[in-house]
């Protein structure tokens, strides 16, 4: 009987005493790979996308569209590898999004795009400023959202607490972009008194220019002494309302005229231009009700990082900061955790695979006998285990696509 290569190979494994050890080892390394392979919600599909911000101060949306957006769309569509270009025109600027074909090199695409823009900048209308490019990838999607809210907390206080927490979270390894959305930023406002300006013979233009010149920090030169060179820096940035009020804006009756003499200066939240609330729906299992001012802190991961591990590290750090940084009247609630959902999907898959293996084994045993059932019971888990090992060795991640492939 001609067994062939496959038959001879199978015969060697059937007769070998190390075959059971290889089977057990395959199951163990597959189980280990399941926990070591990075888990994430979204697959690592390379679809280069770039957002281009083109400032055009003073232009209305219709003018931005006619004079900037349409011409840029036509120009960028001609770049090799570009799949789609679309734009949004708003007051003072245009947002152009360029999407490349799947598999295009992201860095090379950015270089080609920038070169094309610079080559055609002379065709832009007068007043258009230098464009700003920002690459968009799947890793920009936040894997964790933390919402700061409180019954008596103000939006300014919520944002201040969230920003302080965000600064601490940026020190964690493999963390990507950390953003704070909602709330009110700190703003120092200068409210000029026109009567005092007229009385002291000072114009608003003078004050604006003096504020711009004073809010700087630069290198003024160097001092050399005994073979040592000391760098001299002058000026400083404004840090408080007192710093702004102490700016000298002119002379009056031979004495310095300070900004606080002709204006009222406040240090507090900016003017409200958006509202963000946190609340519960009617189906909440604890019966909670109400809506409260809120600020959301979003955390994205770096490419290739494990969303589950990163989310656990962030949550552990936040638990520490609750005691030191977050005020007592502010509650931090987890509103999104892709690391948690990714882990749930992995274990749900393993559970369903186990049920399927047992069901198939029972059916095979009923119709073909226990020998065929035993082969099925052992071969299927080993195959999946080795597949998971291959995922780990080739730097794949466990996500909705790779899990579906299993």
Model-derived segments and spans:
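Small-residue-enriched core segments of transmembrane alpha-helices in multipass membrane transport
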Residues: 113, 362, 373-395, 404-406
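Membrane-proximal extracytoplasmic
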Residues: 1-357, 365, 375, 396-401
């Amino acid at each position: 009987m001609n067994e062939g290569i496959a038959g001879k190979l199978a015969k060697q494994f059937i007769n070998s005493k190390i075959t059971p050890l290889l089977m057990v080892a395959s199951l163990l390394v597959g189980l280990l790979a399941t926990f070591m392979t990075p888990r994430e919600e979204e697959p690592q599909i390379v679809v280069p996308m770039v957002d281009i911000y083109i400032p055009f101060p003073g232009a209305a949306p219709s003018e931005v569209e006619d004079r900037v957006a349409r011409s840029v769309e036509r120009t960028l569509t001609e770049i090799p590898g570009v799949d789609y270009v679309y734009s949004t025109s708003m007051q003072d600027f245009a947002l152009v999004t360029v999407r490349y074909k799947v598999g295009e090199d992201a860095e090379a695409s950015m270089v080609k795009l920038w070169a094309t823009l610079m080559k055609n900048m002379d065709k832009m209308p007068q007043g258009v400023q230098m464009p700003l490019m920002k690459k968009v990838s799947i890793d920009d999607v936040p894997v964790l959202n933390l919402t700061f809210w409180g019954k008596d907390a103000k939006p300014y206080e919520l944002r201040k607490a969230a920003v302080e927490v965000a600064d601490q979270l940026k020190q964690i390894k493999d963390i990507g972009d950390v953003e704070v959305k909602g709330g009110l930023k700190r703003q120092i406002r200068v409210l000029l008194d026109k009567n005092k300006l007229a009385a002291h013979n000072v114009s608003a233009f003078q004050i604006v220019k003096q504020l711009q010149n004073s809010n700087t920090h630069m290198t003024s030169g160097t001092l050399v002494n005994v073979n040592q060179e000391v760098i001299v820096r002058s000026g400083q940035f404004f840090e408080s309302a007192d710093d702004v009020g102490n700016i000298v804006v002119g002379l009056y009756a031979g004495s310095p005229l300070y900004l606080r003499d002709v204006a009222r200066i406040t240090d507090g939240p900016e003017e409200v231009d958006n509202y963000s609330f946190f609340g519960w729906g009617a189906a909440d299992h604890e019966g909670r009700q109400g809506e409260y001012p809120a600020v959301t802190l979003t955390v994205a991961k770096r490419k290739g990082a494990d969303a589950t591990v990163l989310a656990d590290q962030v949550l552990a750090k936040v638990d520490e900061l609750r005691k030191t940084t977050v005020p007592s009247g502010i509650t931090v609630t987890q509103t999104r955790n892709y690391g948690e959902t990714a882990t749930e999907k992995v274990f749900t898959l393993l559970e369903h695979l186990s049920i399927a293996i047992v069901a198939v084994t029972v059916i095979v045993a009923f119709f073909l006998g226990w020998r065929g059932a035993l082969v099925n019971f052992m071969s299927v888990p080993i195959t999946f285990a080795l597949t998971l090992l291959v995922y780990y060795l080739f730097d794949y991640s466990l996500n909705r696509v790779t899990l579906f492939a299993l």
